[in-house]
Amino acid sequence: MKIIVPATSANIGPGFDSVGVAVTKYLQIEVCEERDEWLIEHQIGKWIPHDERNLLLKIALQIVPDLQPRRLKMTSDVPLARGLGSSSSVIVAGIELANQLGQLNLSDHEKLQLATKIEGHPDNVAPAIYGNLVIASSVEGQVSAIVADFPECDFLAYIPNYELRTRDSRSVLPKKLSYKEAVAASSIANVAVAALLAGDMVTAGQAIEGDLFHERYRQDLVREFAMIKQVTKENGAYATYLSGAGPTVMVLASHDKMPIIKAELEKQPFKGKLHDLRVDTQGVRVEAK
């Protein structure tokens, strides 16, 4: 069997740690024959373990410690430490591996509870499990999630040629906001979510770019962000935002305007790459060999 988990783009502006969307890049785990010891075959990086030290197996064995070892093949086009949920995809894959081999019959909500407990927040793991757009919260161990269709639009990801670790991106955030700042920031988030659910991408785009929770503190960590935002705005994009903690920059635009936006961005002296993406509507799934 093969376990497939989509990449995810979290926050979407003001939906800090609570809103995310699944997109069309994938982690795939092919489950092969039983053996005496675990082996993960991959070419993702020399520093990524091939045995039980791999996060995938740490998660699976944390849930079902006595799983029969197997040979696994891991492939992924989800870039590491780029703000597209690479670690979350591995967490969700590990849960699904335990679910399948341990015959746990976990519901999606049970998977979300486990994944959120491990990850600490649901913004990436929720869409990785459910697909589509997910608005979720985790308060004192209680996780709630609403799944919805993302409005019709094109996604364009600018993926830089450098990493930005989440812990580094979080280190520039303020320790706290004043009550007035919190009210303003949450009201913008409310409008962004409501507009997305209503299919109003113009209003959603304005609210997404009006984020007060994190982007203004993080934007200088992604040197291309300001220029990309300027170019995309001049050419009619709905919104441009930092995907997750960055450094990937996500552009949302109508189908007719995106080719123009992409062409203009390709003229810029950036060293990263542009990727056309779509919304993944399935989330984690298992395919028979």
Swiss-Prot record:
Task: Name the pathway.
Answer: Amino-acid biosynthesis; L-threonine biosynthesis; L-threonine from L-aspartate: step 4/5
According to its UniProt record, which reaction does this protein catalyse?
L-homoserine + ATP = O-phospho-L-homoserine + ADP + H(+)
Localization per record: Cytoplasm
Under the heading InterPro entries, the entry gives:
GHMP_kinase_C_dom (IPR013750), GHMP_kinase_C_sf (IPR036554), GHMP_kinase_N_dom (IPR006204), GHMP_knse_ATP-bd_CS (IPR006203), Homoserine_kinase (IPR000870), Ribosomal_Su5_D2-typ_SF (IPR020568), Ribsml_uS5_D2-typ_fold_subgr (IPR014721)
Species assigned in the record: Streptococcus pneumoniae (strain Taiwan19F-14)
Task: Please state what the protein is called.
Answer: Homoserine kinase
Record family assignment: Belongs to the GHMP kinase family. Homoserine kinase subfamily.
One Pfam family, short name: GHMP_kinases_C
**Top-level division of the source organism's lineage:** Bacteria
Alphabetized HAMAP family for the sequence: Homoser_kinase (MF_00384)
